[in-house]
Amino acid sequence: MKQKLHILFVIAVALLGLTACQKSTKDQLVGTWHYVKTMTIDGNTVRIEGTDTNDEDGTYSSVANAVYTFDTEIEGVSVQIKMGVSFKGTGEWTVNDKEIVTTPTSAGVKVTSLKYYDPSDGSFIAELTGNELTETSSAFADELKEGLLEASTEQILVLQENKYVAESTDEDGGKTTCTYNRLK
């Protein structure tokens, strides 16, 4: 009987130790994460590469670069446009069950390049620079900034020590899955 009690006590202590060592989902997400994701918005390709830093106090900072690729016509001529955009943002983050909820408090957007290509063969046509680039892209940058200041939710699909996979759903019901790799 005494031996059975001892075995049960050892098992109970081991289980208690295991549960005491487990980190909460939020604690596991604290750190700096790198991601690359490609998605389609309104039929156009967007490739984003960035870094998010989630702090213990529930704040975050984010920097990213994106390339938007879309086809259009200018004065009856078909062109493919590749627009480079850089983003910066800060805000608050929390975890509810297996969802990451971010509430932005500031966002910055800058169009860094605007290049035109022939869609039939991919050959370079032209590039806007300087004031032309700023004037042409300012309305687009303002619209993007407005969108970045909206709260968002990502469903955590996989959570490991150095990687997590999350899925977001856009307003049209389209889903985007992204893998985040820990930098620190």
Q: What is each model feature region?
A:
Residues 18-184:
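Lipid interaction determinants
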